Amino acid sequence: MPRERKERDSKDHTKMKEEGGSDLSVRSRKRKPNVPVFLQDPDEEIAKIDKTVKSQDSSQPWDDDSACVDPCSFIPTPNKEEDNELEYPKTAFQPRKIRPPRASPLPVLNWANREEVWRIMLNKEKTYLRDEHFLQRHPLLQARMRAVLLDWLMEVCEVYKLHRETFYLAQDFFDRYMASQQNIIKTLLQLIGISALFIASKLEEIYPPKLHQFAYVTDGACSGDEILTMELMMMKALKWRLSPLTIVSWLNVYVQVAYVNDTGEVLMPQYPQQVFVQIAELLDLCVLDVGCLEFPYGVLAASALYHFSSLELMQKVSGYQWCDIEKCVKWMVPFAMVIREMGSSKLKHFRGVPMEDSHNIQTHTNSLDLLDKAQAKKAILSEQNRISPPPSGVLTPPHSSKKQSSEQETE
């Protein structure tokens, strides 16, 4: 019986293969997935695909040139009119012309690409912005309070023999921090100022003063813990952007380029120290006035250099044109008049500071009195300009020949 059953099963299996049936002798024991299975006739699917391809070919004929079209090329949108050139209405607004970037005045550098260095310097001025109207955010403060604080920071820098760069870093940190806050009271100004100087000294000085020394100069108004707390608050508010190109940094570049030698080596300063100190004293006075925040640091340094040199030299070493600095130069006139009346101070020498670095140490003069004189002159000049406005542009004396001819005509 078993033998006959096996023969019968083999015959049935052979018969099913001949009729085109599937081999069902081996069955899967796995459970079927709980998903529906859609069956479709293969011939029917192929017929649909052919029909779709034919319809696409008939609607979009093949173009030999389309195979060579650049995938990044501009393809106009159908049924859309081309945009005509924008026409500005005749209003008070006039589109400003895009000025080319300032050309690099730097000499050839053997340690870097001068164009790359100059580009980084220009980007610094775009990154580190200040607000000239930051006092509007603090109704309880006045511009005089800022001047008193910065004058005191200059005195602290001279006592601890800190560099000019350290002071101007602290000034930048203070102004940018105040622009990010609101409703600061007067009693916090000294803490903010000394904390800004504490941060700047750790960035710039090789041997910065200790924390207790900064607390000591406040005469008990600020403790070390308060300075550390304010330091963290300031750095968070400044988003840890602590490397601006300060006013004195720009001045250092301009004066160095003006006195660069024929070899083009600029690894060490090669300019007269007295010239640098004279221009720096003008900037020390200008920075006490809150109006200086209206101008970029590079413009302030170039304007100060203009007051002690010439337009040609300023253009050569800074890349600015007269129209770029005209407003700042006129704003700086009363401050320059006060500095000239005072006369240039002698170069100070500090114990333990090398002679070649003495011009970089921040000094302190009776700056608040000079500021009062400058603001008084500014008021007088403003009244004179209101009565008879001066012509715009650079004022130059006439040639000697024209001057003689005019004198003969008057006779």
Swiss-Prot record:
Subcellular localization: Nucleus
GO annotations of cellular component type: centrosome; cyclin E1-CDK2 complex; cyclin-dependent protein kinase holoenzyme complex; cytoplasm; microtubule organizing center; nucleus
Sites bearing Phosphoserine, chain numbering: 104, 388, 400
Cross-referenced PROSITE patterns: CYCLINS
Any one Gene Ontology molecular-function term assigned to this protein's record: protein kinase binding
InterPro entries: Cyclin, Cyclin-like_dom, Cyclin-like_sf, Cyclin_C-dom, Cyclin_N, Cyclins_cyclin-box
Signal peptide: none
Residues found modified as Phosphothreonine: 77, 396
Alphabetical keyword list: Cell cycle, Cell division, Cyclin, Nucleus, Phosphoprotein, Ubl conjugation
Pfam families per the UniProt record, alphabetical: Cyclin_C (PF02984), Cyclin_N (PF00134)
Post-translational modification: Phosphorylation of both Thr-396 by GSK3 and Ser-400 by CDK2 creates a high affinity degron recognized by FBXW7, and accelerates degradation via the ubiquitin proteasome pathway. Phosphorylation at Thr-77 creates a low affinity degron also recognized by FBXW7.
Keyword DNA damage: no
Biased segments, Basic and acidic residues type: 1-20
One GO term (biological process): positive regulation of G1/S transition of mitotic cell cycle
Primary subcellular site in the record, as a coarse category: nucleus
SUPFAM superfamilies attached to this UniProt entry: Cyclin-like
Chain intervals for the UniProt region annotation (Disordered): 1-44, 381-411
Assembly description: Interacts with CDK2 protein kinase to form a serine/threonine kinase holoenzyme complex. The cyclin subunit imparts substrate specificity to the complex. Found in a complex with CDK2, CABLES1 and CCNA1. Part of a complex consisting of UHRF2, CDK2 and CCNE1. Interacts directly with UHRF2; the interaction ubiquitinates CCNE1 and appears to occur independently of CCNE1 phosphorylation. Interacts with INCA1.
Family, per entry: Belongs to the cyclin family. Cyclin E subfamily.
Summary of the function given for this chain in its UniProt record: Essential for the control of the cell cycle at the G1/S (start) transition.
Protein name: G1/S-specific cyclin-E1
GN (gene name): Ccne1
